[in-house]
Amino acid sequence: MKVLCIGDSNTYGYDPRSYFGSRYPAAVRWTERLEGHEVLNCGMNGLAVPRTGGPYLELIRSKSPHLAVVMLGSNDLLEGADAAATADRMDTFLADVMAAGVKVLLIAPPPMQRGEWVQSDTLIEESEKLRQRYRKLAEERGCFFADAGDWGVELLFDWVHFSPAGHAAFARGLSEALRECERKIG
């Protein structure tokens, strides 16, 4: 299955331990560990939920993925948006992407925990609320849903970015979710 992955630094493969913020080696990144799938990685450091699907529509038309995997929202929360506003923005984005004719798997990011980048209890609470908002949104939009908070994804010292073991756990969880999507798509 051809899979378009739209996400932030955790999709890109950002390694916060590196001095210049480089990527993990390909063998570590979850996008490179999805066996049996052709993966188009559109992860970008710092990406928040786009206001429209516009930047991805031509890519969807030209590459014809079977499924778009979307995991965004953490940067919105880090920039001060709440879970409700983030989910509303995601709703608009998903409407555009789905109108292009691609099926979508919406993934709730792992909830944040207190650490170097996460100093606020409110931020932690909003990341938990986002999981429920995305679950409801996926039901309303008729797209697939997965909660990465259920996959045992280990985060590094900043409590935002995946560790190498976190990438492996995410790949395992996503592989299972993709099998379920394939079964339903037919």
Language-model regions, residue ranges each:
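Serine-esterase "nucleophile elbow" of acetyl-processing enzymes
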Residues: 1-43, 57-64
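Glycine-centered flexibility sites
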Residues: 7, 13, 43-46, 73, ...
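General structural signal for secondary-structure boundaries
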Residues: 33, 47-48, 82, 100
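Structural motif
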Residues: 46-55
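Alpha-helical cap/lid subdomain in secreted, periplasmic
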Residues: 54-186
